């Protein structure tokens, strides 16, 4: 029997879905991403969403100002789609290299999404322009109708929004972000070359029992919400198969402790400190480490038409405890897997 490897060396990965927030929170969380990843697709759902080229340029500079010396990191900016967004502004940002992609949030689907899209028809001229440009559309794939159960929102979105949209704009490049169901896994697997998906570490590692049985664990609460075990297993099977249109997107989403541990807590897991090691543990459990580098470092650039990073990252089999909390200016931040021991850690 071959002894398990003690070191995993992969091309420097990218994070194709991250929330860096703003202000003091941004300054705290950016180094956890910039230390490990060469690039990251930065979500635009700030309190004042990023809807213009100038706003994206200013936000990008605030991010770069928070990157520590010695970190080689490029934030890839996204435009927040609204019913009133100007297609010319979006095209200008894409041509000028400011916007890498645009993000569709259904109105009120998640944090800071009240400005989101009320219907696909409302933004059809913008989507048609994106199709012509070859600009990727990033989709939070949940319906928000009051009569749809929260555990059914993703599956319903496929039938009522995603599939009709892709039938209408067959050349539109779409990333179905943070997929959580067997329905989405099968839909992406059966889809064409221009449909891809990101998957978070928490949706590969946990299901809704982990969040709800024996007490509520607010730091596992995110949107889309954790689903049944059968859905978790479908995601694991998808990445273990070496499917090339699925790639790393942590959806790392920090909230201060008092906003998570309260009677109406916020959705989001701050997983940036432990995500890469968490993914490695999942791939190892599935005897799929042969596909780990592609998921982290190759599939995303291939879909986006970007070069692979030139640097390398090493993960070592060296147990490391995740801190219980991370200090903020006037609160603290509880990271994903706080207080737990992880098997794989990034070599500093």
Curated annotation (Swiss-Prot):
SUPFAM superfamilies: Metallo-dependent hydrolases
Binding site for Zn(2+) 1: 17, 19, 103, 251
Positions carrying N6-carboxylysine: 103
Annotated residues for binding of substrate: 19-21, 45, 140, 223, 255, 267
Cofactor(s), names only, from the UniProt record: Zn(2+)
Binding of Zn(2+) 2, residues: 103, 140, 178
GO terms, biological process: 'de novo' pyrimidine nucleobase biosynthetic process; 'de novo' UMP biosynthetic process
Note on how the cofactor is bound: Binds 2 Zn(2+) ions per subunit.
Assigned EC number: 3.5.2.3
Alphabetized GO MF terms: dihydroorotase activity; zinc ion binding
Active site: 251
Enzymatic class: hydrolase
Pathway: Pyrimidine metabolism; UMP biosynthesis via de novo pathway; (S)-dihydroorotate from bicarbonate: step 3/3
Pfam families, sorted: Amidohydro_1
PROSITE patterns: DIHYDROOROTASE_1, DIHYDROOROTASE_2
Gene3D superfamilies in alphabetical order: Metal-dependent hydrolases
Keyword S-adenosyl-L-methionine found: no
Keywords, comma-separated and alphabetical: Hydrolase, Metal-binding, Pyrimidine biosynthesis, Zinc
Recorded catalytic activity of this chain's protein: (S)-dihydroorotate + H2O = N-carbamoyl-L-aspartate + H(+)
A GO CC annotation given for this chain: cytosol
Family statement: Belongs to the metallo-dependent hydrolases superfamily. DHOase family. Class II DHOase subfamily.
Free-text function comment from the UniProt entry: Catalyzes the reversible cyclization of carbamoyl aspartate to dihydroorotate.
Quaternary data: Homodimer.
Name by which UniProt lists this protein: Dihydroorotase
Organism taxonomic ancestry: Bacteria, Pseudomonadati, Pseudomonadota, Gammaproteobacteria, Enterobacterales
